[in-house]
Swiss-Prot record:
It catalyses: malate + 6 malonyl-CoA + acetyl-CoA + 2 AH2 + 2 S-adenosyl-L-methionine + 5 NADPH + 9 H(+) = trihazone A + 2 A + 2 S-adenosyl-L-homocysteine + 6 CO2 + 5 NADP(+) + 7 CoA + 6 H2O. It comes from Trichoderma harzianum. This is Trans-enoyl reductase thnE. The gene is thnE. Pathway: Secondary metabolite biosynthesis. Its EC number is 1.-.-.-. Monomer.
Length: 368
C-alpha cells in the first residue's frame, strides 16, 4: 500500500473513547491507531460533534472495546493508495467527515479518537472560511439528509444536478424537525435542488430554519399546525421527511400530506399504527444511514442491515455533490455550542445529550 505519509511516522497507539457496556465508556490511553486501508485517509482530530445516535448506540447496542463517535473535523496526516491516485485530497488538508462509530466489525475506527480512519469519499475538504469547530457538525447530517431525500424518498432529480440556480420545481417538501442538524441540511439541499421546503420547529428556531432556506415554518406545538401546512401547500403536499420520528411528528406529517397522498420517510422507526391510517395513499418507510459505509450493520433488531454496495456508492456520490456546493460557497454550517475539556469534555457532552437533547444547535468539543 502506498500513502503520502507512512504509518511508521505516526504513533501506534492513541487516546480514544471506547465503549465498555450499555451506557458505559472509558477514555483509553493506548487504543490502536486505525490501519490505513487503500480507500481511507487518516485524520488528526481537532474537533468532534456529539449526536443523539452516539448515546442511543452506546445505551442500547454497545460494542465493548470499539471507539465511539461519528462526526469529526481535523487535518489529514496520511492517505491510502486509492486516495492518493484520486488526487482530490492531500496531507495537510483541513477536512470534516463521518465514520461509523462503535462498529464491532471495525472497532479501531471512531470519531472520538486522536486519529480517525475515514473513507476518503466520505470526507469534505473545507474552504478557508469554515472553521474546524463549525465543520464538525457537517458529516452525519449531510449523509443522513442526502440519503433520506434522494435515495430513500427518491425525489425527482439527480444529486449531480444540485446547484444554486436550478429553477423551482414547485414541489413542496415538509421537513419535520427543521431545526435539527439533519433538518437544516435537508432544507438547504432541497432549496438548492429547486424544491420548496417547508418545515416545523419551535418558534424560537423559526429564524434559524428560514436562514437555511425554508419558505415557511410552522409551530409543531400548535394544534392547528397540520391544517396550516395543508392550507399553505394547497392540500398538495406529496413529500415529508421526519427528522424526529416520534409519534407526534409522524401523526403531524400524515395529517399534513395532501389529499392525494404521497411519501413519508423517517430517520428512525415510526409508529405503524399511525401509518395504517392512510396505508392506501401514503407510502411510508424509514432508513438506517449506516449502510453508506458499505459494511454489514450489526445492530440489534430492526436496525440491522446487510452490506449494500448500492448505498456505499450513493454515499460517495452525495458527498461529491455536497463538496461541489461547498466549493462554491453554498453550504451553511449548523449552529454549534462549543465545549472545552478535551476527551473529558466529550464524555461530559454525551451525558449532557442523554439528559437534554440539543435544540437548534450541535454540541461540539475541541480535543486538540
Amino acid at each position: 500500500m502506498s500513502s503520502a505519509t507512512t504509518m511508521g511516522q505516526l504513533p501506534q497507539h492513541q487516546t480514544a473513547i471506547v465503549a465498555q457496556g450499555p451506557g458505559q465508556m472509558t477514555i483509553q490511553k493506548d487504543a490502536p491507531v486505525p490501519a490505513l486501508a487503500h480507500d481511507m485517509v487518516l485524520v488528526k482530530t481537532a474537533t468532534v460533534a456529539i449526536n443523539p445516535v452516539d448515546v442511543k448506540s452506546l445505551d442500547y447496542s454497545p460494542a465493548p472495546g470499539a471507539i465511539i463517535g461519528f462526526d469529526f473535523a481535523g487535518t489529514i496526516v496520511a492517505l491510502g493508495s486509492d486516495a492518493v491516485k484520486e488526487g482530490r485530497l492531500a496531507v495537510g488538508d483541513r477536512v470534516a467527515g463521518v465514520v461509523y462509530g462503535m462498529d464491532r466489525l471495525q472497532p479501531d475506527v471512531g470519531a472520538f479518537a486522536q486519529y480517525v480512519g475515514a473513507l476518503a469519499d466520505l470526507v469534505l475538504k473545507l474552504p478557508d472560511h469554515i472553521s474546524l469547530e463549525d465543520a464538525a457538525a457537517l458529516g452525519l447530517a449531510t449523509a443522513t439528509a442526502a440519503y433520506g431525500l434522494f435515495k430513500e424518498m427518491e425525489l425527482p432529480g439527480a444529486l449531480d444536478r444540485l446547484s444554486s440556480s436550478v429553477p423551482d420545481r414547485g414541489d413542496f417538501v415538509l421537513v419535520a424537525g427543521g431545526s435539527t442538524a439533519t433538518g437544516t441540511r435537508a432544507i438547504e439541499l432541497l432549496k438548492t435542488a429547486g424544491f420548496r421546503p417547508v418545515a416545523t420547529s419551535s418558534p424560537s428556531n423559526f429564524e434559524l430554519v428560514k436562514k437555511f432556506g425554508a419558505e415557511a415554518v410552522f409551530d409543531y406545538h400548535d394544534p392547528g399546525c397540520a391544517d396550516a401546512i395543508k392550507a399553505y401547500t394547497n392540500n398538495e403536499l406529496d413529500y415529508a421527511l421526519d427528522c424526529i420520528a416520534e409519534a407526534e411528528t409522524t401523526q403531524l406529517c400524515y395529517a399534513a400530506i395532501g389529499r392525494a397522498g404521497g411519501r413519508y420517510v423517517a430517520v428512525e422507526p415510526f409508529r405503524e399504527s399511525i401509518a395504517q391510517s392512510r396505508i392506501n395513499t401514503v407510502k411510508a418507510s424509514w432508513f438506517n444511514v449506516m449502510t453508506v459505509w458499505g459494511r454489514k450493520v450489526e445492530l440489534g433488531g430492526e436496525y440491522a442491515r446487510e452490506a449494500s454496495l448500492e448505498d456505499r456508492e450513493f454515499g460517495a456520490r452525495s458527498f461529491a455533490a455536497v463538496q461541489a456546493l461547498l466549493d462554491r460557497g453554498y453550504v451553511t454550517t449548523h449552529p454549534i455550542k462549543l465545549m472545552s475539556g478535551g476527551w473529558e469534555g466529550v464524555v461530559e457532552g454525551v451525558a449532557k445529550i442523554r439528559s437534554q437533547p440539543p435544540s437548534g444547535y450541535k454540541l461540539v468539543c475541541q480535543v486538540a
